[in-house]
């Protein structure tokens, strides 16, 4: 399995465009499955990410808010920053399942996962 495949496998669900209502069962299922994958990934890859998402965002001049995180150009960001964006977006999910919806609707989560997919494809060729 590629490093980020556990997370990027969720792109298939995002692409179906069936998860754009926070009250729908498909959205709720997606959030639970994605969060399970993210938590498992973080516990398996502690060396790839030190868990300090907020500091990583600040170091890269990214505010922890929907607008700034969503408008961030990811083309030059490394894996650590992409993971910090994802963790920042999911931080409030335990309090409010709908917290991830804006990042799905504006396609930020998809862009971030595609960037991780790029890193997996790049590492596979080297």
Feature annotation, model-predicted:
Residues 3-7, 72-92:
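Short amphipathic alpha-helical heptad-repeat segments
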Residues 27, 75-78, 101, 105:
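Helix-start/N-cap signature of alpha-helical segments
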């Amino acid at each position: 399995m590629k490093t980020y495949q556990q997370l990027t496998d969720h792109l298939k669900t995002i692409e179906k465009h069936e998860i754009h209502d926070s009250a729908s069962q498909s959205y709720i299922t997606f959030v639970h499955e994605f969060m399970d994958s993210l938590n498992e990934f973080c516990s398996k890859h502690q060396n790839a990410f030190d868990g300090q998402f907020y500091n990583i965002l600040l170091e890269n001049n990214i505010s922890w808010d929907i607008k700034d995180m969503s408008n961030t150009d990811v083309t030059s960001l490394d894996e650590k920053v992409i993971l910090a964006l994802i963790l920042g977006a999911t931080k409030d999910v335990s309090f409010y399942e709908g917290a991830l919806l804006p990042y799905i609707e504006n396609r930020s989560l998809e862009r971030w996962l595609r960037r991780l997919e790029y890193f997996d494809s790049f590492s596979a060729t080297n």
